[in-house]
Amino acid sequence: MALLQIAEPGMSTAPHQHRLAVGIDLGTTNSLVATVRNSIPEILTDEEGRSLLPSVVHYLKNGSAHIGYKAQAAQNTDPKNTIVSVKRFMGRGLKDIAYAENLPYDFLDTPGMVQLKTVAGVKSPVEVSAEILATLRQQAEDALGDDLVGAVITVPAYFDDAQRQATKDAAKLAGLNVLRLLNEPTAAAIAYGLDNGSEGVFAVYDLGGGTFDVSILKLTKGVFEVLSTGGDSALGGDDFDHRLFCWIIEQAGLAPLSEIDTSVLMVKAREAKELLSSKSETLIDAVLTSGEEVHVTVTAADFIQMTQHLVTKTITPTKKALRDAGLSVDDVDGVVMVGGATRMPHIRKAVGDFFQSTPLANIDPDKVVALGAAVQANLLAGNRAAGDDWLLLDVIPLSLGIETMGGLVEKVIPRNSTIPCARAQEFTTFKDGQTALAVHIVQGERELVTDCRSLAKFELRGIPPMAAGAARIRVTYQVDADGLLSVSARELRSGVEASISVKPSYGLADDQIAQMLQDSFKSADVDMAARALREEQVEAERIVLATQSALDADASLLSDNEREDIVALLDSVRQAGSGTDHLAIKAAVDALAHGTEEFAARRMDRSVRSALSGKKLDEI
């Protein structure tokens, strides 16, 4: 673990003490690396002066790989072994990958994360990403002339535990020490906040190659606070390419294409999309493997019309992020545009129209995330300069909870909570003599465990046997600055403890998270009714167990008629508990509680007499 330097507040480290750290934007389409030199963040270029590294890896038969531009050239000739947009596969199972059937890869649907079969062997998305990160590390060390102490790597705000952990694993494989994982919109806000001295409420609209993220941030006196986040993984520059690709096939009347022809036309579609940002029309020329020639002219108006629905879809999560932050459009002081896809004029116009202001784009949208990450990396490495006294407050996208009796969810950390954070709650045992407690960690907004996502389970054993409800078990949830969760459980009387770091097998897609939130809103009334029923059923089960235990121990305190009355009340509770009317269950439980008050009083009297028997007054 790298040691942080300690210096007087406001003092910068001496030049010979400057520690080399970088910010890395590991993007779907392109990746970048940046650092801070002479207090100014800058992109580190390769030996040919190029700042962008295409996020493409081409595997060869001899086991080696080409990364970046050289790999990009192989997309048309060897698409099966040329992995592009690998970020979309990080922490995902095969069923989670959009358009999987249209991709040229041989996927292996292995437990956990999907694998890709190449001529160089089976590769995981983590290994592919590590190739890109290792190239960026080498590029940075060549430019800076020394080894790096660490890196801040950016991830989409909606990446969950598994996707973040996969990113950290890839960095470790690439020989990088991860100082922190930083949400991409937050990195952009850091760049704008420091460069432009901005204060107020800002929306960060981040449309990259494969994901769409929107974050609402508040910048006040050096504090960067994320108020809410939103997003949709079905929206990205790749989807605009795919729509134009389909349009080309329709216009040219082409039959089903081979993998190579598909790859050729996808590249042509991407090139045309980029040209239409500055031209009114462009000609798409291609020669297919069959010898057939494709000549199609596409205008900017055509492109706007065919992709307008994609642009409109970005506004829905933007509206939701504002609602989550408790704000309206009028409360937003500015909009930051991030991601290469925001270069498209009709996207900028749609965002400007929605927020009724001209979006901020004076920092290159391809570079702004890496520049912000570099600033954060510089601070975490200990290179604090005068004025570097700002605070970063990020949030988690979905609530984290625990399963309680009856399959109910008790939320421990609500969504949009600022991280890093820790929350603790006390729980107890349900049965007499219970010596173990199962801790089931879940993620989501619904009231029942079956409607949420299971993250992990562990057991706390060694609880001293005692009456139900007597044990005190403190469960603590901790989310670190990278958004990774750890949970511990401790029985307070005995001190026995168990813990777990949550590393689920694969992650949630952005649209799955958005769908979970939508489901929670739509099902709120049904969920609350289901929760009310389960709570009453759990209480009924508890009081039946307690009453039966009391009868078994102290039936001699009751007359035959009294005992029969209590047994009848018990039967009523059991019968009501098997039904679906929570009010009927509550009425039966209340009747049993009232009907056993005298019995409880007699048991208490006996216990007191037994405790005082044989003792003198001065001993009490």
Swiss-Prot record:
Q: What does the function comment of this entry state?
A: Chaperone involved in the maturation of iron-sulfur cluster-containing proteins. Has a low intrinsic ATPase activity which is markedly stimulated by HscB.
Instruction: Give the similarity note.
Output: Belongs to the heat shock protein 70 family.
Q: What GO molecular function annotations does the UniProt record carry, in alphabetical order?
A: ATP binding; ATP hydrolysis activity; ATP-dependent protein folding chaperone; unfolded protein binding
- What's the encoding gene here? hscA
InterPro entries according to UniProt: ATPase_NBD, Heat_shock_70_CS, HSP70_C_sf, HSP70_peptide-bd_sf, Hsp_70_fam, ISC_FeS_clus_asmbl_HscA
Pfam (any one): HSP70
The protein's name: Chaperone protein HscA homolog
NCBIfam families named among the record's database cross-references: HscA, PRK05183.1
List keywords of the entry alphabetically: ATP-binding, Chaperone, Nucleotide-binding
Q: Where are the transmembrane segments?
A: none
Q: Which HAMAP family match?
A: HscA
One GO process term, biological-process aspect: iron-sulfur cluster assembly
Chaperone among keywords:
yes
